[in-house]
A protein has these predicted regions:
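Peptidoglycan glycan-strand catalytic modules in the bacterial/periplasmic cell-wall system
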Residues: 1, 6-9, 79-82, 86, ...
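Single conserved hydrophobic/aromatic residue that forms the stacking wall/gate
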Residues: 2-12, 348-355
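Short, solvent-exposed loop/turn elements at domain surfaces
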Residues: 24-27, 264
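Short, Φ-rich (hydrophobic/aromatic) sequence segments
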Residues: 31, 42-61, 66, 314-317, ...
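Carboxylate/His-rich catalytic cores and anion/metal-binding grooves
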Residues: 43-63, 109-134
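Beta-lactam-recognizing serine transpeptidase/beta-lactamase-like catalytic domain environment
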Residues: 65-70, 74-78, 118-170, 174-353
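Conserved, well-ordered alpha-helix/loop/beta-strand core segments that scaffold catalytic motifs
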Residues: 72-111
């Protein structure tokens, strides 16, 4: 019996907790634990923590006579085994924050992720639109699933961890940290911005603000021009890196270290890795020596080929709050087994250093 405490919204039930379903023929072949008619986790925590939640099956061995009648326990029950209940999970989700996020996303398409920087615990995880989990139970499960699958708004799609979007201006703090680390700029380096960046026939528009501008106000005002200039100052520095490709690889390494381009390892199924291009990606398009900073300038402001999940973007904010490291985001705070009386701590305490 898998019980859930407190009243919960549909988003939380579907996206975080998930649901259970009858095991498939393939699962029966792959795992000797299951028997026909057993249930297993299908989505969310139910799937990720199935091995903890399902417990251990009990066993009773009986002695039968030649007519198949039970005569008693075999060897007085020496081979019997008591069932062990599954372990209880404690989640990190802040229910008030989760419910508030769900309210904000009603009738909208998108996602909300909130992370506690000091632990990596996910306090809220919202994807919209969603559906009622009860639709995927009972006799109508198959037809309901087909309708949800064909819905153009993709309610089955967990946008918080599966969707990949251009991170846009949320990417600029990352860029600023890289440029400082590589000494492409200082905190006092200024660049002009007259409603945008203009160079070699390329135009990247920007809004009206003071000019010239240095790094901190460039972040606070989200100046596109500043990051275009600074990006070129790093990528086109052949004296330091030798080639454009080498400079770009140095840039990419920082981005990956900050949690982009690969799965973060959240304890929920279906996480996307997003996309961070490497130098080979552009060399195949333009030739090894046919591109430079201006060619891929949209990358400098989180556009172009750069894609990130909402989880990765939220994790960057946690990394900055921690001044250069993050913990693997996770929704489960602890795992315990009240039957055995022990407590198993489930934590992601290894810090991932970035800068």
């Amino acid at each position: 019996d898998r019980s859930v405490s407190r009243g919960l919204g549909d988003v939380y039930k579907r996206q975080v907790l998930g649901n259970i379903r009858e095991v498939s023929t393939q699962e029966l072949k792959n795992d000797s634990y299951y028997m026909q008619g057993d249930y297993t986790g299908d989505l969310g925590v139910e799937k990720s923590y199935e091995a903890y939640l399902r417990g251990e099956k009990g066993q009773e061995v009986f002695l039968r006579n030649a007519y198949g009648r039970i005569k008693g326990r075999y060897e007085n029950g020496a081979f019997d085994r008591e069932a062990v209940p599954g372990k209880n999970l404690t989640l990190a989700i802040d229910m008030e924050l989760q419910q508030y996020g769900e309210q904000l996303m009603q009738n909208k398409v998108g996602a909300i992720v909130a992370i506690e920087p000091s632990t990596g615990e996910i306090l809220a995880l919202v994807s919209s639109p969603t559906y009622k989990p009860s639709l995927l139970t009972g006799r109508e499960r198959g037809s309901n699933y087909a309708q949800l699958f064909e819905n153009p708004y993709k309610p089955l799609y967990d946008r918080a961890i599966m969707a990949a979007y251009p991170p846009g201006s949320t990417f600029k703090p990352t860029q600023g940290l890289i440029f400082l680390q590589e000494k492409a700029v200082t905190p006092y380096t200024t660049y002009p911005c007259h409603h945008g960046f203009y160079s070699s026939g390329v135009k990247v528009a920007c809004h009206d603000h003071v000019s010239p501008i240095s790094l901190v106000p460039a972040i606070s005002t989200s100046c596109n021009a500043y990051f275009c200039y600074a990006f070129r100052a790093m990528i086109d520095n052949l004296d330091k890196y030798g080639t454009t490709g080498a400079a770009f690889e140095a840039w990419k390494k920082y981005i990956v270290d900050m949690g982009y381009g690969y799965r973060l390892g959240v304890d929920l199924p279906g996480e996307s890795r997003g996309f961070i291009p490497n130098s080979d990606f552009y060399s195949k398009i333009y030739g090894a020596n046919g591109w430079k900073g201006i060619t891929v300038i949209s990358v400098s402001i989180g556009q172009g080929e750069v894609l990130a999940t909402p989880l990765q973007i939220a994790n960057l904010a946690a990394t900055i709050a921690n001044r250069g490291y993050y913990f693997t985001p996770h929704v489960v705070r602890s795992v315990e087994n009240t039957y055995l009386g022990d407590a198993v701590s489930y934590t992601h305490l290894r810090a991932h250093e970035t800068l």
